[in-house]
Amino acid sequence: MAVASKVTVIVVAAGKGKRMGRSYNKQYIMLENKPILYHTLAVFEKHSEINEIILVVASGEEEYCQGQIIKKYGLKKVRKVVAGGSERRNSVKNGLEELEEACEVVLVHDGARPFITKEVITKSIEVAYEEGAVIVAVPVKDTIKRVNEKMEVVETPERQQLWAVQTPQVFRSGILKRAYKEAEDFERVGTDDAVLVEAAGYTVKVVLGIYENIKVTTPEDLIIGQGILNQRKDGEQCEWE
């Protein structure tokens, strides 16, 4: 009998979030009386196409997450909690090592992005099955300048070609594993998973995301995040075009 393919999400929550100005990990800050990380995990917990979640947290926080988030809120799809590394790519690599052989598609998502929607997740999985590699992104709204070390403008790229990349980033598992193996072999670095996949020779497709899918990074983001939750409770979707 053939083994059914799985869709796994690696939720990366190992960063300390120094820009938040807190003494503890930003993913544990409360929104609506629940940790940000809970809100993120709950989206994937409720998604019918997600079979399991691998949660990557800062070293030493594994037991806390098991007790205070996973067990406390009854999250059944979190199969494994693993310690992250010194950099994001190390944390993702640790998560990849926990993938089961049956996993065909893997999503990588920031633990501090709790406002991703079911619809965007579904579309990104669909495209990943078809194309192999996909990122979620939105067109930039502002004019972007390249600036040198003297604080001089050196270039103004065409805004129509610029997209702000979010997560999840979604791949056939074999593609992402190969990209990370080559990154290790050739000492490649990148700020996201797609950079490593591109460097390995794959084409990465783009799925249109939503502007609400912010990464909660600064105190101001908490205010915006509360506004998003309030809008959603009222059955609305924020339109910040």
UniProtKB/Swiss-Prot annotation:
Source organism superkingdom: Bacteria
GO molecular function, one term: 2-C-methyl-D-erythritol 4-phosphate cytidylyltransferase activity
Keywords, in A-Z order: Isoprene biosynthesis, Nucleotidyltransferase, Transferase
Annotated pathway: Isoprenoid biosynthesis; isopentenyl diphosphate biosynthesis via DXP pathway; isopentenyl diphosphate from 1-deoxy-D-xylulose 5-phosphate: step 2/6
Residues flagged as site, Transition state stabilizer: R19, K26
Catalytic activity: 2-C-methyl-D-erythritol 4-phosphate + CTP + H(+) = 4-CDP-2-C-methyl-D-erythritol + diphosphate
UniProt EC number: 2.7.7.60
InterPro entries assigned: IspD, IspD/TarI, IspD/TarI_cytidylyltransf_bact, ISPD_synthase_CS, Nucleotide-diphossugar_trans
Keyword Transferase: yes
Top EC class for this record: transferase
GO biological process, alphabetically ordered: isopentenyl diphosphate biosynthetic process, methylerythritol 4-phosphate pathway
Site (Positions MEP for the nucleophilic attack): R159, K215
HAMAP family, per database record: IspD
Entry-linked NCBIfam families: ispD (TIGR00453)
Record-stated family: Belongs to the IspD/TarI cytidylyltransferase family. IspD subfamily.
Role of this protein: Catalyzes the formation of 4-diphosphocytidyl-2-C-methyl-D-erythritol from CTP and 2-C-methyl-D-erythritol 4-phosphate (MEP).
Protein name: 2-C-methyl-D-erythritol 4-phosphate cytidylyltransferase
Organism expressing this protein natively: Alkaliphilus metalliredigens (strain QYMF)
Lineage summary: Bacteria, Bacillati, Bacillota, Clostridia, Peptostreptococcales
